[in-house]
Structure formats: structure tokens, C-alpha cells
Amino acid sequence: MTDKKRIVRCGLIQCSNPLNDEGRPVAEIQRAMVDKHVAMIEDAGRRGVQILCLQEIFNGPYFCPSQSTRWYEAAEPVPGPTTELVAGICRRYQMACVVPVYEREMSGVLYNTAAVYDADGTYLGKYRKQHIPQVNPGFWEKFFFKPGNGGYPVFRTRYAKVGVYICYDRHFPEGARCLGLNGAEIVFNPSATVAGLSQYLWKIEQPAHAVANGYYMGCINRVGTEAPWNIGKFYGTSYFVNPRGETVAQASEDRDELLVADLDMGMIDEVRGTWQFYRDRRPEAYGEITAQ
């Protein structure tokens, strides 16, 4: 008799900003985005999602084109009121969650962070975005975030071992490998990126990480355009990819959407039993990577 398959139902939420008015208070803009997400989080619970991930700094617009200090007001402790609110909703459905927010460690020390909670609402820890871009046409993130200092943690939820790699991180294979070495079965990549800059890479990099490291990835991008900056269209197309590099499920380019997929954890052993990348890697030969 074979063992019962371990299937994990995962969800991604891609969402447009409902209040595109730079003249409104930061707290009001954030509240509108949170209110919009609450209904979608509830829907995920009703649909039986076991692990849910939201988009990069989900509770507001992608404000990095502004280089305005007013957006420092958007930062909060982690864990904090926003992450605890989401975790409380998810707990009612026994749903683990990844909650990306703008973190304030102390005055002047701010991070791009994702909090991870287990299905019973227990706070498991956080991942801080390691790679901080300064890239046209408006990704001025060094104005807002310090580079992460917490390594590449993997969180043991009730359903699976989860890692997080935020947006620009995905351009760097080194951290993706660290997540695999640390035991990740599913890596979530919450993002905010626009057409014309990275859309072709969106279809390449995460499947490559999934194949090279033998895990699933859940990749999220927001949708719509955000005034007043209008740096381009956030092209959505959130998706899940399996350890073979095959797309399991994909969302639209332009609609608010909850994407749900059932992921077979048995495929991880199957793929790693064929492609022995962990056995055959040569860390002693890679010193040049960190020596310069």
C-alpha cells in the first residue's frame, strides 16, 4: 500500500490599489487596501487554502517612485497590528499565511519584510528582503529600506516548510539556493514589478529557481497602475511553478484575483531523486562567489 499523497492547497492574492490619491493621508490609503484584502482573505479561507501569501507590502501602493519621507509613516513593527489582523482572520480557517509589510524596527531603521504565521495564529518569524534595488523607472528602494539581516530562514508550518524571497531577490540565485539548503518545500516570491522592465524575466527566473533547487514557488505581482507615479502597468500574472519548472496555475494580467493551486509535495522527492543537484554541488569550488 502506498502512502497517502501530501497535497497542500496554497493561495496567492494579486490586488490593485483602490485609493490612488497621493493627497490622502497614508493611514487612509493603507486602510482602503487592507479592507479590500480582507474579503479576498476570507474567500481563501472558504476555499480551503492552507497556506496564503499576499503581495509585496500588500497594505498600500508601491510608493518607492515617490522618494517622499511621508511614506515612512507606513512602516510598523513586525509582528504588529497589520500582520496580527491578517493572522487572526487566517486562524479562523486554520490557514497559515505570509504577510508582507513595511517594517519599522526603530526610528530610521526600516525593512521590506514578510511575517509568517502558522495555521493556529502562532508567529513563526520574518524574512527581510536582502537585495534592495535602485533601478529606473522608479524603483528607488534604497531611499526606504535597509538590506535584510536575517539570512534565509525556512518556517515549518503545519502543512509545509516555507521560505520567502521578496521581489528583486529573485534576480539572485544564491539566496534561492540557501532556501533550498535550509529545507524549503515552497518558496513564496511576493513582488511589485511593471511591464517593459522585467516581464520577460518573470517567466524565466522563478521556474529556473524551482528546477535548480527542487521546490515549488508561488510568485505574486500586483495589478493595475498607481497614480500619481504611473511608472507602468503592474502586470499581475501571479503563478505557481512546480519542481520540474512547469506552471501549475496562473492568474490574469489585469484583474484582482485569488489564485489557488493544490501542490503535491511528493513531487519534490521524485524530482530530487532524478536530478541530484544537492548531491553534486561543489561548495568548496565556489569560493570566488563570496571572495569578490
Name these PLM-found stretches:
Residues 84, 88, 105-185, 195-208, ...:
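Active-site catalytic loop in hydrolytic enzyme cores
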Residues 26-126, 193-212:
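Cys-nucleophile CN-hydrolase/nitrilase-fold catalytic domain and related Cys-dependent amidase chemistry
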Residues 268-292:
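A conserved C-terminal secondary-structure "cap"
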